[in-house]
Structure formats: structure tokens, C-alpha cells
From Swiss-Prot:
Primary location group: cytoplasm
Description of how the protein assembles with itself and partners: Forms a cylinder of 14 subunits composed of two heptameric rings stacked back-to-back. Interacts with the co-chaperonin GroES.
Primary gene name: groEL3
Family: Belongs to the chaperonin (HSP60) family.
Keyword ATP-binding: yes
NCBIfam families in the cross-refs: GroEL, PRK00013.1, PRK12849.1, PRK12850.1, PRK12851.1
Native source species: Nitrobacter winogradskyi (strain ATCC 25391 / DSM 10237 / CIP 104748 / NCIMB 11846 / Nb-255)
Protein name (database record): Chaperonin GroEL 3
Pfam families (alphabetical): Cpn60_TCP1 (PF00118)
Length: 548
């Protein structure tokens, strides 16, 4: 076991704080409409330019192991917020830095870290409740567009596109973001179906960066039972190889010899193939396989119908223009199914929804209906260079996540205003324990951090902005950093999803609370690398005595 280096109390916290500051300072320059870009070196290809907080955070590794631990904890804040809300990662990082800084000062002044943590938790709970009360449901497509515009850094065309896509496929519809070959960014509504089953083996992946399998103009084999043996599969595999098209296999499961053969064929390049488990269970699985069959103009290979796998021909397989498979989901886009068949199936499902008395069954039938009738919206991001396209795609994905969050939990005034106004709720809390009260005050001060940073990135003094906003009693009054003026944020369309604001604060306080209560840090000592062997073969001279 390698020797360890251990740091305690003040020394540990100081090093950790240095790491937190390095990461947070790199991330927070991207906050707000006048946030700057960060350029990230790539080991190959052109550098990446981004304004996405979590992308910057994920790239940072520090040489000092103790500083790196602090940085990685804050990176976790950005990642967690991104996973839960899909946006707000920079806000979460700024909040975490503010709480850790003030917390470290309080601990250095001799306060009890556990009481401070309790105070932080009490204050955060009050803010979350306050944000919930302020949140207003998204009522119109215009509000969806406003959220998208703010999250994409003030790009109204992106906001409009997302609102248009959501209108077409519904709030629960599937919207994906792709890179466009041309200069234009456009939205395309495609008939399609998405279900929650990913690839059975990572060896099916065709796009290593996204860890996804992408099959164009694919055949689709739908099988009701498990596939274990290879023999029955061979005729259909040979027919598909001759056609030169990729193949998607959807079955109850694919394992053993069958899965091994598919993986080997995929790796050798003989057959572009992917296999996924069928969605659902029992009778519902069979119904969903039939839905896919109708959508792709294929046949479900079922023993009940007297069909044998070895007798399957190409015209019994479904067809789709594109199939996208990641670790958790499969999306079938532009199936070859006839419109009248799909409409008839949709009619059947609607009739069953009206007949059913079970809420659970109704919910599952509505899911199937959305998958069949909703379709998939694809936003294609274009640009003059690959770097520009990637930067814009980051912003489109942020905006899409933010609009989904807004539809889910409503909207609040943007630009850091909601958190600043929540100070009132925290200010009302009084605790007899002075250390717990100090923890509450840490959050009270941290709630100013996002709006200060937005103002500073716009070249304005943060404290003046905070003071001006707090002087005005109108709840929606805030600072428009784009135009550098004080306005009614909601009337101006500067709004944030309540879920993003709430998640950012909860994740930031959770990790910051752990950092504040840290008393010791343990890291491996760097190993001394042995000197490299000298080059050349001069050392072999002693072999002469061996009679060669």
C-alpha cells in the first residue's frame, strides 16, 4: 500500500479553498449575458471554446493533490446540477464558492463546523420554500421562448426554435440536438419513437465521443422471445450483410452465443449491428413491439403466429431512416410505416384509454400514444467552423434543458433576482445558537454572489447593483446586464426556471457544507519514478565469453 500524506485543520482547509477558488474563478467568468468564453486545449484537433460552466469544470485537474480534492468537490456541484436540472451549473459553482469561503472564515474564527452546517441547511430549506412560492407556471409558448433565449445567452432565435419544437411534439416529446452540415441552424420535426432501453453491449457504439450507436437507413428485427443461439439468426444476418445496411435487433434479451457473434461481427466490421432489450414487460412489452412494427412497417416475429426466426426474410424486417442508441435510450426516427396504419393504431390506443378504469394503465397507454403520435424534434445547429458549431450546440442544449425545467416547476425572475429576494425569508430566521445563526448568515451573504458576478462580468460594480435592487420593493425588479439598466425582469422576459435556481442552491450548499466540516485530508504521496534505462545496446559487450 502506498504511503499517504495527511493534512489537518487550517492547512487542509486552506489548500482545499485554493482548489475551490481556481476552479470557481475559471467557471464564473462565463456567468450572465456578458459572460466571457473559456478556451480549452484538446489533446488532438482544435481547442474548444465554451461558455458552459460544467464543460469548463470537467476539464480542470490540479497538480497539488489537496487543492485538486477541493476543485473536484466543486466540480461535483456543477455535474450534479447539470444532471438534475441541465442548466445553472455556473450559478451553483458561484454559490458553492461563496458558502465555502465564508464557512472557512467562520471555522477559522473558532465556530463549530457542525453547527454552521446545520445553519446552512436551515437557511437553504427556507430559500427553497420561498422559490417554490414565487414560481409561476409557464403559460405560453412566448414564455418558453424567453427561457430558451436567456439560457442560450440572449440568442432569441434559439429560444424561438425550442418553443416551436415543444409546441410540435408537446412538453413531454423528444427533442434532440445535432450538428448541421450547413451554416444554418434549423428545427426539423420527424416522426419517431423513443423508449428507455440502451445497447446491450458497449461494443455496439459507433460514436465514441457520445458513447452512442448511430445506425442510418437500418433494418429492424423485432423478436418476442430471448435470442441465445446463433444458428437460427444466421439466415437473417447473412441477408442483411448482403444488403449492406445496418441492423437493429429488438428482443426480450440477446445473450450467450448470439450476443458474442453480433459483437465479433460488429468489431470486425462485417456487419453494423446493435441489439437492445424490448421495452416494457409482459403483455405491455408485446404491445410496444407491435407499435414499433407498425411504425417501421415490419413484422413481430412471434411463436404464437407460427413464425420461426430461421424463416425470416428481409421484407419481414422493419425499416427506419435513423436509429440512435445510447446507454439508456433508443430512438427510432422516420420509420417506414404507412401513415394510415399508424393512425389506425393511434385510434385503437385512444379507444383503450377511454375504456380503461385503471390510472396506471391509462398512464402507460398515454405514454405509448405520445411515442407513436408525438414524433421527434431535431434541432440542427449550423456554423462556419466546427469550433463555432460546438460552442453553439452547448448553448442550445443548455437552453433546451432550462425550458424543460421551466415547464416542470415554473419560472422566477432571472438574473440572480430570485435568490436575492429570497434573503428576506432567510433574514426572518433567528436561532438561539450563535454558531447555527452564523451558518444562516453565511447563506444570507452567499445569495448575493450570483447577481454580483453577473454585474461584474458586465463591467459594473456588484455591490451598487445589489444595493439598488434591494432599495426597490417591487419583487420582480432587477438588473438587465445585457443593457445595463434596472427593469421589471418578468415583463422584460428575463426569467429563470425555478427548478434550476433551486437545484443550484441545494447542490452548492450540500457540497459546501461537507467542505466546511472537513478537518483532515488524506492523499497519496507522489511516487519517485525510477530513472529510465539508458538507450542503445552498448551494454551487451559481456556476451563474448559465450562462444557465439
Amino acid at each position: 500500500m502506498a504511503a499517504k500524506d495527511v493534512k489537518f485543520s487550517g492547512d487542509a482547509r486552506q489548500r482545499m479553498l485554493r482548489g475551490v477558488d481556481i476552479l470557481a474563478d475559471a467557471v464564473k467568468v462565463t456567468l450572465g449575458p456578458k459572460g466571457r468564453n473559456v478556451v480549452i486545449e484538446r489533446s488532438f484537433g482544435a481547442p474548444r471554446i465554451t461558455k458552459d460552466g460544467v464543460t469548463v469544470a470537467k476539464e480542470i485537474e490540479l497538480e497539488d493533490r489537496f487543492e485538486n480534492m477541493g476543485a473536484q468537490m466543486v466540480r461535483e456541484v456543477a455535474s450534479k446540477t447539470n444532471d438534475l436540472a441541465g442548466d445553472g451549473t455556473t450559478t451553483a459553482t458561484v454559490l458553492a464558492q461563496a458558502i465555502v469561503r465564508e464557512g472557512a472564515k467562520a471555522v477559522a474564527a473558532g465556530m463549530n463546523p457542525m453547527d454552521l452546517k446545520r445553519g446552512i441547511d436551515i437557511a437553504v430549506a427556507a430559500v427553497v420554500k420561498d422559490i417554490g412560492k414565487r414560481a409561476k407556471a409557464v403559460a405560453s409558448s412566448a414564455e418558453v421562448a424567453q427561457v430558451g433565449t436567456i439560457s442560450s445567452n440572449g440568442d432569441a432565435s434559439i429560444g424561438k426554435m425550442i418553443a416551436q419544437a415543444m409546441q410540435k411534439v408537446g412538453n413531454d416529446g423528444v427533442i434532440t440536438v445535432e450538428e448541421n452540415k450547413s451554416l444554418e441552424t434549423d428545427v426539423d420535426i420527424v416522426e419517431g419513437m423513443k423508449f428507455d432501453r440502451g445497447y446491450l453491449s458497449p461494443y455496439f457504439v459507433t460514436n465514441a465521443e457520445k458513447m452512442a450507436a448511430e445506425l442510418d437507413d437500418a433494418y429492424i428485427l423485432l423478436h418476442e422471445k430471448k435470442l441465445t443461439g446463433l444458428q437460427a439468426l444466421l439466415p437473417v444476418l447473412e441477408a442483411v450483410v448482403k444488403s449492406g445496411k445496418p441492423l437493429l435487433i429488438v428482443a426480450e434479451d440477446v445473450e450467450g452465443e448470439a450476443l458474442a457473434a453480433l459483437v465479433v461481427n460488429r468489431l470486425r466490421g462485417g456487419l453494423k449491428v446493435a441489439a437492445v432489450k424490448a421495452p416494457g414487460f409482459g403483455d405491455r412489452r408485446k404491445a410496444m413491439l407491435e407499435d414499433i412494427a407498425i411504425l417501421t412497417s415490419g413484422q413481430l416475429i412471434s411463436d404464437e403466429l407460427g413464425m420461426k426466426l430461421e424463416n425470416v426474410t428481409l421484407n419481414m424486417l422493419g425499416r427506419a431512416k435513423k436509429v440512435l442508441i445510447d446507454k439508456e435510450n433508443t430512438t427510432i426516427v422516420n420509420g417506414a410505416g404507412k401513415k394510415k396504419d399508424i393512425e389506425a393504431r393511434v385510434g385503437q390506443i385512444r379507444a383503450r384509454i377511454e375504456e380503461t378504469t385503471s390510472d396506471y394503465d391509462r398512464e402507460k397507454l398515454q405514454e405509448r400514444l405520445a411515442k407513436l403520435a408525438g414524433g421527434v424534434a431535431v434541432i440542427r445547429v449550423g456554423g462556419a467552423t466546427e469550433i463555432e458549431v460546438k460552442e453553439k450546440k452547448d448553448r442550445v442544449e443548455d437552453a433546451l434543458n432550462a425550458t424543460r425545467a421551466a415547464v416542470e416547476e415554473g419560472i422566477v425572475p432571472g438574473g440572480g433576482t430570485a435568490l436575492l429576494r429570497a434573503r428576506k425569508a432567510v433574514g426572518r430566521i433567528n436561532n438561539d445558537n450563535s454558531d447555527v445563526q452564523a451558518g444562516i448568515n453565511i447563506v444570507l451573504k452567499a445569495l448575493e454572489a450570483p447577481i454580483r458576478q453577473i454585474a461584474e462580468n458586465a463591467g459594473v460594480e456588484g455591490s451598487i447593483v445589489v444595493g439598488k435592487i434591494l432599495e426597490n420593493k417591487t419583487e420582480t425588479f432587477g438588473f438587465d446586464a445585457q443593457k445595463e439598466e434596472y427593469v421589471d425582469m418578468v415583463a422584460k422576459g428575463i426569467i429563470d426556471p425555478a427548478k434550476v435556481v433551486r437545484t443550484a442552491l441545494q447542490d452548492a450548499s450540500s457540497i459546501a457544507g461537507l467542505l466546511v466540516t472537513t478537518e483532515a485530508m488524506v492523499a497519496e504521496l507522489p511516487k519517485d519514478e525510477p530513472p529510465a534505462m539508458p538507450a542503445g545496446g552498448g551494454g551487451m559487450g559481456g556476451m563474448g565469453g559465450m562462444g557465439f
